[in-house]
Amino acid sequence: MLQPKRTKFRKMQKGRNRGLALDTNVNFGTFGLKAVDRGRLTARQIEAARRTITRAIKRQGKIWIRIFPDKPITEKPLEVRMGKGKGNVENWVALIKPGKILYEIDGVTEELAREALRLAAAKLPMKTTFANKMILS
């Protein structure tokens, strides 16, 4: 699972997920999966989608994961009364804004990339779309 090796603070406030993403272009590969909605992706969801892409392209080509779960999410145990401090860190999430490129693929055909990213999108809790590399001439 993806998670930071070390952080300055163990726990983080919830915060708000507003605005649009900054990195909206396919930079490394030829094809990408772009988020349409905003939301949170857990480390397990990111890994499940990555494994789906790897299986779909039969381990040819190259995959880039453009997101990293760097926000800790805390939970209190079941049947514990309110108060007594913040809960323990249970999982790590990446905050996703609209327009963010989640995954990139290179070295495969467009139809294979479309199919692989379609299968990966089914594992994610948000709407996504297929993105091509912009070539400025």
UniProtKB/Swiss-Prot annotation:
Recorded coiled-coil stretches:
none
Q: What is this protein called?
A: Large ribosomal subunit protein uL16
Q: Which NCBIfam families match?
A: rplP_bact
**Protein source organism:** Baumannia cicadellinicola subsp. Homalodisca coagulata
What binding partners and quaternary form does the record give?
Part of the 50S ribosomal subunit.
Domain of life where this protein originates: Bacteria
GO BP term (any one): translation
Q: Which GO terms describe its molecular function?
A: rRNA binding; structural constituent of ribosome; tRNA binding
Record's keyword terms, sorted: Ribonucleoprotein, Ribosomal protein, RNA-binding, rRNA-binding, tRNA-binding
